[in-house]
Amino acid sequence: MKEGKTMDKTKIIYEKVMAFKQRFPGTVAWRLKAHCKVAADHINNDEEILYAFAAQKSYSMLNIVSTFVVVITDKRILLAQKRFFFGYFYYSITPDMFNDLTIKMGLIWGMAIIDTVKETVYLSNLSSGALQEIETVISKYMMQEKRQYEQEITPEERSKLQNELRNMSKHGE
């Protein structure tokens, strides 16, 4: 049964990433199905996939071979990459580890920088048009999740945010 659930998650993630790529075709990304499969393998059954996109996990705009799939669930942010020959890379950012988000825009591509307690994650080669959507999604998600850590939020508020992120993933802003 696990294989079927993983395939469903892979399909959901892949569809969200491809919708992102269609809205922002300038984003540089390769081997998306393989990366989506790695992400799906690490999503727990009680997590809901809210948003997904692809980017290069690198500080350098010249590095175009380090594609990662970034998935936002209702509990955390996941980054996954299937290595070319064997193995994979996987990172998880929980709301309590998140510090801040920085957006940098260049002439063609931009970068989203996620600062965590342990490290700084650079997501580069993003279409400059995608930066505002990514900033909105990550900021809204993290503010809501951090608020939940500090004080209890109502189920209605949580549901409203999740619906907003789902719709943004389907249609953009």
Please state what every model-predicted region is.
Residues 2-25, 31, 38-40, 62, ...:
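Acidic, Ser/Thr- and proline-rich intrinsically disordered linker/docking segments
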Residues 44:
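Glycine/small-residue-rich phosphate/adenosyl-binding loop
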Residues 47, 73-75, 94:
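A generic structural signal for short beta-strands and their flanking turns/coil linkers
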Residues 47-62, 82:
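The phosphoinositide-binding surface of pleckstrin homology
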Residues 49, 69-70, 105-106:
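Short, flexible segments with low predicted structural confidence
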Residues 52-55, 71-73, 110:
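Small-side-chain structural scaffolding
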Residues 64-84:
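Short, compositionally biased strand/turn segments
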